[in-house]
From Swiss-Prot:
Biased composition (Basic and acidic residues): 24-37
Role this protein plays: Cell division protein that may be involved in stabilizing or promoting the assembly of the division complex.
Membrane protein topology class: Single-pass type II membrane protein
Compositional bias annotation for Acidic residues: 74-103, 366-377
Gene: divIB
Compartments where found: Cell membrane
An annotated GO BP: FtsZ-dependent cytokinesis
Organism of origin: Streptococcus gordonii (strain Challis / ATCC 35105 / BCRC 15272 / CH1 / DL1 / V288)
Transmembrane segments: 139-159
Organism placement in taxonomy: Bacteria, Bacillati, Bacillota, Bacilli, Lactobacillales
Extracellular topological domain residue ranges: 160-397
Name of the protein in its database record: Cell division protein DivIB
Amino acid sequence: MTTKDKGDQKELQKYLSEWQKRHQEYLEKKSQEKASETDEEERNAEPLETSESAGTKETDNSEDEKEDQTQDQASDDDETNESEESEDVEEPEEENIEESSDVSEDRTEKFIGQADVGIEKEAKRDKPRIERIHLYRALPVLVISSLLILLSLYFITPLGSLKNLVVTGNERVTQDEIIKATQIDSRDYTLTTFLNRNQYANNLKKANSWIEKAEISYQFPITFKIQVTEYKILAYEASTGNIYPVISNGTVINQPVKKEALPENYMRLNLSDKAKVKKLVQELSDVPDSIKNEIQTVDLTPSKATKDLLTLTMRDEHKIIVPLSDIHKKLPYYSRVHPLLTEPSIVDMEAGIFSYSASLVQKEEQDQEQEKEESSEETVPGETEAAPSDVTDETNN
């Protein structure tokens, strides 16, 4: 093998795998062994040729001089033939060497081709992996940048402030009043409205006394549902002539109600003090509804011992006298006393719990009024009689 071939093989070894390198070395070793064998055969063939030429010369000396010329010619012919034979022998050896080198070259070319194919396949396999890795690395950046672009477009365009407000659960408060109380502006972004929805619900509860609960929920894409729960009306306050609703938390709503809008049966409070109204509502919260629904009017009737004494007139004409601060304790006992009452009675719960007939009280009141009238009539003539005497005394003086 020439130096050029060796240089080419060295360059190719860089691209071959470990197994291919070993196989290539094995082939080179084989080719070297074959070359050494051919060299030995050539060396062995040279002494044989010299021995044959010496034998022919000895036989030629024993013959006649005449035959020397012919033998010399024959020897010359033999030498030419031997040279030709040696050349013929060398030619197949060279052919064998060339064939072995050709085979090795073919094999190396095959291995080189296989190596190139393997390298190409590996390159093809590696290329998509590298591309995927770069894609995976760039994916977060692409996602974040695209989201930022979409958000900027959303806030710049009027789509960012579109809102559809839906109010449910309202009976006494209009939809416009509720939306106004939330303080949601039409220019507010949909996103900020979603983030501050709890604050808007608190604004609604603070601004409107009717609202007990408020909840704002979001429905994609632009709908906000305002669910409200209103306080129930417990009674009506009518101490000033106008009738105002009293809701279940004890607040007197400063919106007069027309008599035509009043229900058939309702609790009428004749209490001008709003603090006492709130206290009454708190006390009645522990009283059963069966008793509360039977109360027709509530009047403040203080006594010398109890300043917050109330008189509750029931729908069946019974009356209950009870202190405001003891309603939650004593008024529930009315359900036990009520079955024992056969006629309109007064149930006194100021000091204890006892009842007496209302007719007797009315009779006593009537008797007291008559006595007052009689006493007033008796005192009037005395005064008239005393008047002239006073006049005479003055004249005498």
